């Protein structure tokens, strides 16, 4: 969408957009939903799942995030705007190290347990 000089002046002067322009934007939104054949419930479910997946990797601002359908040049797109607070790469890395250390500890305990079982007792030799 190209911004015209009139749009810029209207924004600077605090003028409300023309009702025809507002109606057109609303119609485009309705058409985008119709073309995608997605119900509002399905779109909301997709939004929640997208947030959950992204939150596994980065800390996001859920309140500031938005998932919407946009149409431009007869093409409908699902657009996710998810403000990132910070990367969780360090947290994920630390968690992976902790799991690895736990696995090593369990493995060591199993080796000790197995070696103790294989040691023969004096009664078994008689």
Curated annotation (Swiss-Prot):
Residues 92-126 are annotated as: Disordered. It comes from the Bacteria. Keywords: Cell cycle, Cell division. The keyword Zinc does not apply. The keyword Plastid does not apply. InterPro entries: MinE, MinE_sf. GO terms for biological process: cell division; regulation of division septum assembly. Belongs to the MinE family. Prevents the cell division inhibition by proteins MinC and MinD at internal division sites while permitting inhibition at polar sites. This ensures cell division at the proper site by restricting the formation of a division septum at the midpoint of the long axis of the cell. This is Cell division topological specificity factor. It comes from Prochlorococcus marinus (strain MIT 9303). The gene is minE.
């Amino acid at each position: 969408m190209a911004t015209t000089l009139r749009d810029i002046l209207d924004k600077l002067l605090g003028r409300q957009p023309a009702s025809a322009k507002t109606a057109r934007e609303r119609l485009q939104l309705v058409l985008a939903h119709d073309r995608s054949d997605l119900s509002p419930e399905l779109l909301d479910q997709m939004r929640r799942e997208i947030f959950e997946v992204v939150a596994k990797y980065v800390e996001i601002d859920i309140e500031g995030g938005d998932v919407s359908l946009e149409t431009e040049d007869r093409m409908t797109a699902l657009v996710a705007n998810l403000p990132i607070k910070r990367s969780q790469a360090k947290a994920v890395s630390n968690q992976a190290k902790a799991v690895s250390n736990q696995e090593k500890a369990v493995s060591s305990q199993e080796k000790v347990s197995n070696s103790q079982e294989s040691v023969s007792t004096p009664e078994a030799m008689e």
